[in-house]
């Protein structure tokens, strides 16, 4: 990690704006998981069909993520972010108008298209502005918005229980449309003289999708990161997709309370974990370039017994302890993924690389979420999938230790490896 360069003037403003964007991004995608009972009462569907609503979103979202990352590498990151936010917010509002299962399924797929562009572009924009020992913390702050959005997703079940499921989609869709207008005024890419990406652009480097994919998969480090991030999706998406239902049935909670317990405790703890992990990695990186890798591995090692506690204890207070510990430590993986990519990838392909990782994670996560619904229809406990998620985290922690800093097969100087 090089000495801290002077940050561009808007560096922390950008983090604040993207914090709100990340909050809306995840709130709009997860509210549907907390209103299962109300939604099924209004639009008849099987458990597998309910699971398919999340799976369809993930398949489209993941499938388009590499292309979405390429757009952020090739064009203005800020414009990609603004367009993505406006379109997915409009689709969130349109979801409230759905009357049939088929219409609901279509809106979820369209949301996958529009939301795919946000996270790769947002995290790459943070990396553009924060090039020294503030990167992990800045990334953690932006992903903190994601955690808050996931936690607020529990409001979907609460609103649906007290009025109608469509009201939540109408409200949050309109909020997102208004905020997109705010970003149009305030969000900007960094000045061209700041950041290695601008330097590479001035040197005439051209980002092409085919060349980017070839460069990524010629790297042993990236292949390891690709497999690691995908396998980690088993645990992450199982908790997001089925924890509210598991708590509702296992502990006999009403829908609204189950949704809040499943989202608030995990995501508030994750918010703290993002900051703790970011600060820890930033400080450690001053003496060890693999700090972001080690911090992530340690976090996964703690998250495994935490999720096992949730799915085995008969006591709700102990389950909440497990959810808090899981949320706190699994967050290390999220806040350090972009810094890890900055250690191992050609700087021109950072957003594309993150998009490719999202593809595999969403394919795995979507299959796992759908499997949860299919297993419920077959009267098999969802807790079995939580156990499989814990096993996947053990594998991920081991794989991380084989990733080493350095960009293979590129002529970019060593000083440019920090994006």
Regions found by a protein language model. Give the residues of each.
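Conserved MFS/SLC helix-loop-helix module at the cytosolic interface between two early adjacent transmembrane helices
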Residues: 63-99
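Juxtamembrane intracellular "pre-TM" segments in multi-pass secondary transporters
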Residues: 2-7, 191-226, 250
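Helix-breaking motifs and short loop linkers at transmembrane-helix boundaries and internal kinks
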Residues: 44, 76, 97-103, 131, ...
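Structural signature of the two symmetry-related core transmembrane helices
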Residues: 79-93, 291-307
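Cytoplasmic helix-loop-helix junction between adjacent transmembrane helices
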Residues: 107-145
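Extracytoplasmic gate region of multi-pass secondary transporters
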Residues: 32-33, 220-275, 330, 334, ...
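Residue-level signature of mid-helix packing/kink "hotspots" within the transmembrane helices
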Residues: 30, 58-66, 150-151, 267-275, ...
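Helix-loop-helix hairpin linking two adjacent transmembrane segments in secondary transporters
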Residues: 142, 146-189
């Amino acid at each position: 990690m090089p000495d801290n360069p002077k940050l561009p003037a808007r560096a922390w403003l950008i983090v604040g704006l993207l914090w709100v964007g990340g909050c809306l991004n995840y709130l709009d995608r997860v509210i549907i998981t907390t209103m299962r009972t109300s939604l099924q009462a209004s639009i008849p569907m099987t458990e597998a069909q309910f699971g398919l609503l999340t799976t369809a979103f993930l398949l489209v979202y993941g499938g388009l993520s590499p292309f979405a990352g390429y757009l952020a590498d090739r064009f203005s990151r800020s414009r990609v972010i603004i367009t993505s936010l406006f379109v997915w917010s409009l689709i969130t509002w349109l979801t409230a108008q759905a009357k049939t299962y088929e219409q609901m399924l279509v809106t979820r797929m369209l949301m996958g298209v529009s939301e795919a562009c946000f996270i790769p572009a947002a995290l790459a924009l943070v990396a553009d502005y924060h090039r020294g020992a503030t990167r992990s913390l800045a990334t953690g702050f932006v992903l903190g918005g994601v955690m808050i959005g996931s936690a607020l997703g529990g409001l979907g079940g609460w609103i649906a229980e007290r009025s109608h499921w469509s009201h939540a989609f109408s409200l949050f869709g309109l909020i997102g449309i208004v905020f997109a207008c705010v970003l149009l005024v305030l969000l900007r890419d960094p000045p061209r003289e700041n950041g290695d990406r601008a330097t590479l652009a001035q040197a005439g480097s051209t980002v092409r999708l085919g060349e980017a994919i070839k460069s990524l998969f010629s790297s042993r480090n990236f292949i390891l990161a690709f497999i690691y991030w995908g396998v980690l999706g088993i645990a992450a998406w199982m908790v997001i997709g089925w924890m509210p239902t598991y708590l509702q049935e296992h502990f006999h909670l009403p829908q609204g309370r189950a949704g809040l317990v499943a989202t608030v405790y995990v995501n508030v703890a994750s918010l703290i974990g993002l900051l703790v992990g970011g600060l820890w990695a930033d400080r450690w990186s001053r003496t060890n370039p693999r700090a972001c890798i080690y911090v992530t591995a340690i976090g996964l090692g703690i998250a495994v017994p935490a999720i096992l506690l949730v799915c085995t204890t008969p006591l709700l207070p102990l389950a909440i302890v497990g959810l808090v510990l899981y949320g706190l430590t699994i967050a290390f993986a999220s806040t350090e993924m972009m810094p890890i990519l900055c250690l191992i990838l050609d700087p021109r392909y950072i957003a594309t690389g993150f998009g490719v990782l999202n593809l595999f994670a969403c394919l795995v996560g979507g299959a796992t979420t759908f499997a949860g619904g299919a297993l419920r229809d077959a009267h098999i406990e969802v807790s079995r999938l939580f156990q499989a998620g814990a096993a996947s985290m053990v594998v991920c922690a081991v794989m991380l230790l084989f990733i080493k800093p350095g960009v293979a097969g590129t002529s970019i100087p060593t000083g440019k490896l920090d994006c």
